Amino acid sequence: MRRRMEINHHRTYRGKAAVFLLVTAALLAGCANERTEDELSYRKIGIESMQSGDYEGALAAFDGALACCTGKITDLEIDICYYKAAAQYAAQDTEGALETYNAMIDYDGKNANAYYLRGCLKLGTGDTDGAKQDFADAVKYNHSDYELYINIYKNLAAYDLAEDGTAYLNDAFSIKGNDAESLAY
């Protein structure tokens, strides 16, 4: 009889533990959903602030969105970082934008777009060697993006470095071809 009571007690305990775990999981999922909604709301406010020229407000909103992130970094946080860097640049905080791109590259060392955008900023600050290295890394991690090669060439040419950009232009032609139809992208 005593053994039967112990078994029933264990069943009851396991049942309560299972219910507790399910309720906890549901609450945490609800919190995660709420955080994601808050993050999206802040992101939207940031984008709207950028569109109206309120870059400081945009930065505050993007920082608020990123503060909602706890745990795993997702594509949403990466997207918010791109917006944050754009707002920093628009607010003439090139150093802040560079730091944001540095953080993105530290997180994902193969983020070709972050390398490209950081290279563009470095080019604008006069760090041509740093820009060239970032452009090389961008194509290293996204070697089949025709438009990336063309954009690198255009950026280099805009800073009187067309000669350095010629290799990128030639690589673009090897990706897409150099007949008239291919060039009409």
Where are these predicted regions, by residue range?
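Short coil turns that delineate tetratricopeptide repeat
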Residues: 70, 109, 143, 177-178
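Canonical tetratricopeptide repeat
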Residues: 76-79, 83, 117, 151, ...
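Canonical positions in the second alpha-helix
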Residues: 65, 103-104, 137-138, 171-172
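Helix-start (N-cap) detector for alpha-helical repeat units in TPR-like alpha-solenoids
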Residues: 39, 73-74, 78-79, 112-113, ...
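Register position in tetratricopeptide repeats
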Residues: 51-52, 90, 124-125, 155-159
